[in-house]
Amino acid sequence: MEDPNPEENMKQQDSPKERSPQSPGGNICHLGAPKCTRCLITFADSKFQERHMKREHPADFVAQKLQGVLFICFTCARSFPSSKALITHQRSHGPAAKPTLPVATTTAQPTFPCPDCGKTFGQAVSLRRHRQMHEVRAPPGTFACTECGQDFAQEAGLHQHYIRHARGEL
C-alpha cells in the first residue's frame, strides 16, 4: 500500500514526534533524541530543541546557557555563580568603591593579569577561567617546593616558583 503524501511524512518537524514512513501511524520516538525538560517533547535534533527552549521557556534557556559561568567582582576579584549574587556582593563595597582589577586600554593589546600569580591574559574570560584553577586546590604535596615546602596545584606554578628562588626573589 503506497502512502498518498510521502513528502509530508518525510519532513522533520518541531513537534513531539518525528514523522516516519516506516511506521503505520507515522509517529516514532527515537531513543536518545533531545527532549524538553519542562514539557517532555522529543525533537528530531538539538537545533529544534534549542529553538523550542528559546521560544517556549526563555528563562530556562538563559539559565541553561549561563550554567557554570562565573561572575567576577572587578573590585576584589571574587567570583560568584550568578549575577544576582555578584550584585548583592558589590553593594558591600559601597558607592565609592573603585575597581582594583586592571582596565584594558583601547590603544594597545588588552592584558588582564592574574592577581594570584601574575600571569597575563588577552581576554577577561581567559583570566576568569584561569582564576578557577586557583580555587581548585590539589591535595597537599602534589607539587611541593623542595626548598621552602610551598604547595602548588600545577607543575607550571612550581616551575615559576623555582625561577623566583633562583633569582633570589624568595
UniProtKB/Swiss-Prot annotation:
Gene Ontology cellular-component terms listed: nucleus
PROSITE patterns for the chain: ZINC_FINGER_C2H2_1, ZINC_FINGER_C2H2_2
Subcellular location: Nucleus
KW Zinc (keyword) present: yes
Domain of life: Eukaryota
Keyword rRNA-binding carried by entry: no
Zn finger intervals (C2H2-type): 34-57, 71-93, 112-134, 143-165
Principal localisation: nucleus
Disulphide bridges, residue numbers: none
Annotated SMART domains: ZnF_C2H2
Biased amino acid composition, Basic and acidic residues: 8-20
Region of interest called Disordered, as start-end residue ranges on this chain: 1-29
Entries under InterPro entries matching the protein: ZnF_C2H2-type_TF, Znf_C2H2_sf, Znf_C2H2_type
PANTHER family: TRANSCRIPTIONAL REPRESSOR CTCFL-RELATED
Family listed: Belongs to the krueppel C2H2-type zinc-finger protein family.
Function according to Swiss-Prot or TrEMBL: May be involved in transcriptional regulation.
Protein name: Zinc finger protein 576
Organism the protein comes from: Homo sapiens
Organism classification: Eukaryota, Metazoa, Chordata, Craniata, Vertebrata
